[in-house]
């Protein structure tokens, strides 16, 4: 069996990552989580049925996204969890993570089968095991479920 890999979009991402397929809308979401070292982090959306591509630049480092039932997103940004409305571009804070480490930020994350959004922290210099694994529950409470992560 052989596969053919095809480039769908030449969007110039520095670090395109975290793809999420929204089965309800037929849309592919992903992040260009470059951080402020290269340019503004951004959220991207591709509608394969039309070829339409949208992106939103952020003033925060972005680590992960999850799709909500209403077509909006939940984001794991550098300092906490946020709602994001693609129609307005508005960010709404859900909760900050209680992390005293100045070099840490939320990085990668995914939703489990119970609908809980997990996001792990990372040390920007990848040296110290001081980060946590955080869980955002459907009641919007957050819990630190593990620590000692680099």
Where in the sequence are the language-model features?
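A short loop-to-beta-strand structural motif that recurs across blades of beta-propeller domains
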Residues: 41-44, 80, 131-134
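Blade-loop segments of beta-propeller domains
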Residues: 47-81, 92-105
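Surface loop/turn motifs at the tips and blade-to-blade linkers of beta-strand repeat domains
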Residues: 8-14, 55-60, 95-101, 144-150
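Short loop/turn segments that connect beta-strands within beta-propeller blades
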Residues: 47-51, 85-89, 136-140
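Beta-strand-rich domains and repeat architectures in extracellular enzymes and scaffolds
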Residues: 7-41, 57, 61-65
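Residue-level detector of Asp-centered blade-edge/turn motifs that repeat once per structural unit
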Residues: 21-25, 67-70, 111-114
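Hydrophobic alpha-helical segments and helix pairs
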Residues: 91-147
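Residue position within the beta-strands of beta-propeller blades
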Residues: 29-32, 74-76, 118-120
């Amino acid at each position: 069996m052989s596969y053919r890999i095809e480039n769908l979009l030449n969007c110039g991402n520095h670090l395109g990552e975290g793809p999420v397929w929204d089965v309800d809308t037929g849309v592919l979401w992903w992040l260009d989580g470059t951080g402020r070292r290269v340019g503004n982090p951004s959220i991207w959306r591709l509608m394969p049925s039309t070829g339409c591509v949208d992106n939103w630049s952020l003033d925060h480092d972005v680590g992960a996204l999850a799709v909500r039932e209403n077509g909006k997103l939940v984001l794991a940004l550098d300092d906490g969890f946020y709602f994001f409305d693609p129609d307005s571009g508005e960010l709404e804070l859900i909760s900050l993570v209680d992390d005293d480490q100045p070099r840490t930020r939320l990085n990668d994350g995914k939703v489990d089968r119970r609908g809980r959004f997990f996001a792990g922290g990372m040390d920007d210099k990848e040296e110290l095991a001081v980060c946590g694994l955080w869980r955002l529950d459907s009641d919007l409470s957050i819990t630190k479920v593990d620590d000692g992560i680099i």
